[in-house]
Amino acid sequence: MKRNVLLSLLFVLANALAFAQIVLPPGASPQSPQDPGYQGLIASCKTPPPPPAARGGGPGRAGAPGGAAGAAAAPATFPPPPADYTVTAIPGVIAAGQKWTKVWETSGNNADGILADKDGNLLIAQNHNSAVVKLDQNGSVSPVYRDTHTGGALSMNKKGALFMVQRGLRENVTELAPTRRIHADKLANGDPLDCLGGVINDLSADSRGGVYFTMGGLFYADAKGNVTRYGESLTTNGVILSPDEKTLYVTNGRTVAAFDVQPDGSLKNQRQFVELPSGGGDGLTVDAAGRLYVTAGPAVHVVASDGKLLGSIPAPYGLITAAFAGRDKKTMYGVVSLIDPTRLQHAYVYSIPMAAEGYKGRAK
């Protein structure tokens, strides 16, 4: 027992150093490892979390070890000038010469998970503000949900149930609609999810009432909230189901892994789906044709349903996530996260016209 407590304390110290790289805005909601009560909670874990190095990766978009590159390092001037880029045509996906347009900006880690609502507006998870806001097609922002316990990524299933990862102390996957309730917050041994180490990064909700989520590894919380881990040698970040829900995609550093989804939601046949041309994969989305879109560095990589890399859509800055929205769901939105010289995060939402249509069978 004493050895486990010592290991837990060493983990807390290492994790605190990673989180100290980013300054919280005044009044911001802390993520679990930043909370003063985190050390005591971790010391009670039956199975202590592994050290950050064992989970792989640097700070991800959730600000947690184990993700992709995440927010860029503080530049000498802020914001840094945008990179020059030229969009070349990808047949059926995007026309040549299209440009990204900045449509909204805010301070803090306040534009993390994004997805479309039924009217084509963009729902945005605000991690530091513990809120969800709606960005309409006229550029106006209004609150939708408050007090989301440092809520991050969002996912809506085909039946309209909206789920969110909540990253405050005692992390959980929460259903926001139609009924607001905690969906999953414990592992099979009774430990809180915090005992996995770091914070929950992303999620994808299925039509069975279950939710796949990433937290260093890959997990599935079934309709009753029972959590099972899947996959081997994974350094996860983004996760999403194919339109037919027969395949689950999850980023794994410079590659994307795929799994066959079984009738009960369990996963089999882990395999490498595609190797990315640059950067570590972060956010994922799909279109109506079943193509997969992966944000990695200053680009969105487009992958056919058979794993063939079709091309890349360059961007002026590194993107942490992307989603289709708009009235016809033919606009792609991407989120940029930058850190200023005071170590404060800033979030920017960009949009670009697409030839491809986002999948309309669910929000993302």
What is the predicted role of each segment?
Residues 6-7, 130:
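Short amphipathic alpha-helical "recognition" segments used for binding
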Residues 7-18:
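Bacterial N-terminal signal peptides
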Residues 1-4, 322:
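Positively charged n-region of N-terminal signal peptides that target proteins for export
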Residues 21-364:
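Sequence-structural signature of mature extracellular/luminal beta-sheet repeat domains
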